[in-house]
A protein has these predicted regions:
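C-terminal regulatory domains involved in ligand/effector binding and gene-expression control
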Residues: 1-76
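Short flexible coil/turn linkers enriched for glycine and charged/polar residues
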Residues: 21, 50, 90-92, 133
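Solvent-exposed alpha-helical segments within well-ordered globular domains of core cellular machineries
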Residues: 34-41, 45, 84, 114, ...
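Ordered, amphipathic secondary-structure segments that act as subunit-interaction surfaces
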Residues: 66, 73-105
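Glycine- and Gly-Pro-enriched alpha-helical subdomains that act as flexible
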Residues: 95-98, 105-137
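Conserved small/polar residues in nucleotide/adenosyl-binding loops
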Residues: 140-141
Length: 141
């Protein structure tokens, strides 16, 4: 068991507008993959009319579970940048869904990578970062 790890304090949402495309990052703490999948399904239902609902999550003490999806965006331009934000901060037990409403202007692969990555970062900043420490408590009688 790790003595300390990084996660988020709360669930949160943040929004970014990039060339008329609207990006909504929703972030939530998750305990396991089933909880992450339920959260993703909830966001897809909430934002059913969105162009894309991209996700990434990282779960486990040693990040044993890492998943991401581009949800129809060009390969590697959406889910990977979101996962990279989680990996870069070593943020565990966290799921991020970035919803995109297309604004009519193509962003290009570099623009997509930057927009999805920035959206995820804004969502995590809004949620707040927490350091979790495990302690042993001994009781003598």
């Amino acid at each position: 068991m790790l003595d300390e790890y990084t996660t988020i304090l709360n669930g949160a949402e943040a929004e970014l507008i990039e060339k008329k495309s609207r990006f909504i990052a929703t972030v939530r703490p998750v305990k396991d993959e089933n909880e992450a999948k339920a959260f993703i399904a909830e966001m897809r239902k909430k934002y059913w009319d969105a162009t894309h609902n991209v996700f990434a999550y990282q779960i486990g003490e040693r990040n044993e579970i890492q998943r991401s999806s581009d949800d129809g965006e060009p390969q590697g331009t959406a889910g990977k940048p979101v996962l990279d934000v989680l990996m870069g901060g070593d943020i565990k037990n966290t799921a991020v869904v970035v919803t995109r409403y297309f604004g009519g202007t193509l962003l290009g692969t570099g623009g997509l990578v930057r927009a999805y990555g920035r959206s995820a970062k804004l969502g995590i900043e809004e949620a707040g970062i927490a350091k979790v420490r495990h302690y042993n408590c001994l009781l003598y009688t």
